[in-house]
Curated annotation (Swiss-Prot):
The chain crosses the membrane at residues 74-99. This is Cytochrome c oxidase subunit 4 isoform 1, mitochondrial. The modification N6-acetyllysine is found at K4, K35, K42. The modification Phosphoserine is found at S31, S33. The gene is COX4I1. Residues 100-144 are mitochondrial intermembrane. Belongs to the cytochrome c oxidase IV family. GO terms for biological process: mitochondrial electron transport, cytochrome c to oxygen. One of its GO terms (cellular component) is mitochondrial inner membrane. Keywords: Acetylation, Membrane, Mitochondrion, Mitochondrion inner membrane, Phosphoprotein, Transmembrane, Transmembrane helix.
């Protein structure tokens, strides 16, 4: 069978808050009871019951403004998916640190850093603006 494509040049129905009156009614093909109700609508509206007024509204519109403004629960799905991917990434990082990367080099030890700093001070590395400029060589302590 062949599927009939939608002609987008024709007016269409859409429920949007910024476009409150769509070009066409929500229900395009009326049943016999809906046609009778539309005929009754042409008379005085005071003779219509509340249910008939609601039915007339539902023929014209799919949702009311309250229904359009009602929040959805989509944010829960988004937050859940984000937390899943954050957790998955954290597990990958933990596994990489444990099984892929080796131990830190010995140059990261506090003793090694202290020896390297003392060596840089002894060599007077960058005496104008750098490390050696902040060291008092007479008192053997950092300048205050």
């Amino acid at each position: 069978s062949v599927v009939k494509s939608e002609d987008y040049a024709l007016p269409s129905y859409v429920d949007r808050r910024d476009y409150p009156l769509p070009d066409v009614a929500h229900v395009r093909h009326l049943s016999a009871s809906q046609k009778a109700l539309k005929e009754k609508e042409k008379a005085s509206w005071s003779s219509l019951s509340m249910d008939e007024k609601v039915e007339l509204y539902r023929i014209q519109f799919k949702e009311s403004f309250a229904e359009m403004n009602r929040g959805s629960n989509e944010w829960k799905t988004v937050v859940g998916a984000a937390m899943f991917f954050i957790g998955f990434t954290a597990i990958l990082i933990i596994l990489e640190k444990r099984y892929v990367y080796g131990p830190l080099p010995h140059t990261f030890d506090k003793e090694w850093v202290a020896m390297q700093t003392k060596r840089m001070l002894d060599l007077k590395v960058n005496p104008v603006d750098g490390l050696a400029s902040k060291w008092d060589y007479d008192k053997k302590e950092w300048k205050k």
